[in-house]
C-alpha cells in the first residue's frame, strides 16, 4: 500500500513541515508584501512563492474540511475547521487583495508572456474589482453556515431491520431486487430528511440572504451574476447557461424519458418510482465494493 502514496512536491518558500496557524504563516505574507520587484525575474519568482504559499494553505484547509465532513461529531476536528475559517481565512482575504494590488502595480507585469499570463492577469483584475472589505466577515459566516449543513446531514441516520445506518449506507438497499424493501427504505430515508426540514429551510434562507448581501456590496443585482465574475467565468454568461438548459430539456430529457420507459417495461412496471432507478434490471444482486485497502 505504501507504493500508492503520491510523493509531496518539494517546497522552496515554506518549510516542508509547518504547523498552519496565522502566527506561523504571517511572516511569509509579510515577505511577499515587503519584497521589492525590480526585475522581471524577481516578479516571476515572487509569483512562484505566492503560489506555493497559497497552495499549502488551500491543501491544509481542504484536509480540515474533509476530516470535518467525514466525522461531524468530533469536536477537535470541528474546532480546527472553524479556526481556519474564523482566524486565518479572513486575514488571507485581506492579504490576497493587497498582494493582487502589489502585482498589478508592478511595472514588469505586462512584460510577462501574454499567451501564458493573460488569463491570470484578467483574473487578478476582476478580483480587485469585486473585492469589498465588508464582505470578508460575511464570507466567514457563510463558511460556518455551510458547515452547519454538513453537520445536520451527517447526523442523519435511519434504522433498518433493527440496525442503524447513515443515509449513505442505507442507500445501498435501493439496489435490492426486492421492490418492497426498496420502497420501505426510500420512504424511511425521505422521512428522516423531512424531520430536519424546518432547520434546513431556515439555514438555506440565511445563506440566500448573506449571498445576496455579498453581491449587493460588490455592486451586483444578484449572487449569480457576482459568482460568474468571482469564479472567472468570462467566456460565457448566464444567458448561455439558460440556453444550455433549454438544449438539455429539448435533446437530453426525451432520451432519459425513453430510457426510463424501457427500464419500467423490463421490470414489468407501469410506472417507475424513485426507488426503481438503481436496481439492476437483469436481476443481478447489487455489487459489493471492497471494504478496505487489502481487498482493493
Regions found by a protein language model. Give the residues of each.
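A well-structured
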Residues: 1-289
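Accessory "access/gating" subregions that flank catalytic or transport cores
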Residues: 289-296
